[in-house]
Curated annotation (Swiss-Prot):
Active site (UniProt): 399
Ranges in a coiled coil: none
Protein family according to the UniProt entry: Belongs to the arginine deiminase family.
Lineage, uppermost ranks: Bacteria, Bacillati, Bacillota, Bacilli, Bacillales
Organism, as annotated: Listeria monocytogenes serotype 4b (strain CLIP80459)
Protein name: Arginine deiminase
Amino acid sequence: MKMEQALNITSEIGKLQTVLVKRPGSELENITPEYLESLLFDDIPYLKMMQKEHDFFAKTMKDSNIEVLYLEKLAAEALREANNKESFLTKMIKESNQMDESALYVRDYLMSFDEEEMIRKLMSGLKKSEIPERKKKHLNEMMDEQYPFFLDPLPNLYFTRDPAAVIGNGVTINRMFQPARRRESMFIELILKHHPRFSNQEIPVWSGRGEPFSLEGGDELVLNEETVLVGVSERTDARAVERLAESLFSRSPKIKRVLAVEIPETRSFMHLDTVFTMVNFAQFTIHPAIQNQQGELNIYILEKSENGLEITPRRDFQRVIAEVLDEPEIDFIPCGGEDVIVSAREQWNDGANTLAIAPGEVITYDRNQVSNDLLRSAGIKVHEVISSELSRGRGGPRCMTMPLVRENLK
């Protein structure tokens, strides 16, 4: 009997069956005004309301018969199965740049907790005030006391899209661009290696977190079983895209091409999925500002050749997408419509960041009324979720999910 695949993503729109999320937790309560920028936030969310909104989001998916898995639960279960808390903890502490006696304090303190509480503390951050009184021997310990954390919080973890992405039956476990997020993919690596749901399968890792160049899941879109679209953005390096293409062409039996699309390197356009998402077989939502008035932008077609990679530059974005999807025409639905003010406002609040749960059916933030009405006018079924606090982290429904299994399109 053939074992069911633990991972299977061959499109952006196939009926979503299993998804990985992270419920916002105490890591959000360790954000302070002084460290907003370094933790990649513009404001401090209200956690209680944020959790209510996230629970509503999860319920919306469950009501559509989607299996919703939680990162924090799977990580604790995987850590228990690994039966080696100290090894994972040592690696986490090292990547947090803790050295000398402070690393020993942190390790000994966290080793005293069970797996659930250890994972919670690794995610929420470890304040210096939490560890019992310790003798300071070194100059750096005495001078660095004003900084409140041994381990920084990971408040962006509820955006599970970025640390990893499923392509086909394999995965990219990503090297994140910002230091504030770099440890996030360690939890995905732990789960895939040790959780019984995944550990008994040979899951190809197309790109690992030890890669030299940054790659993030918000820039990875699986258009069909033969084509991956990757944004070259503020967070994803062109060299990472090329290395990913080489890996896919040499190890994946189905991927024939990788499309690299260049988008402006700004915070508001931090990933491709903040400006472009697939909502149906031949329909996408797009932020008009990423193209010129002729609808052009730089897109590169990477294909395997006898001499390695063949790269073909193009400018006609819409036509390229139509060609690879074998569609006569592609409908681009503008985020916020044609009004530049409305478009900019709704894109900032993730109006283009839709999560497709089936062909022609999406989840969006309720606040983006113009974009949602345009989607409905184009025949798309829209489920709106409450979003006043979730949106403060600069990510939408697609950002908050890592799809693990979708049905293949017929």
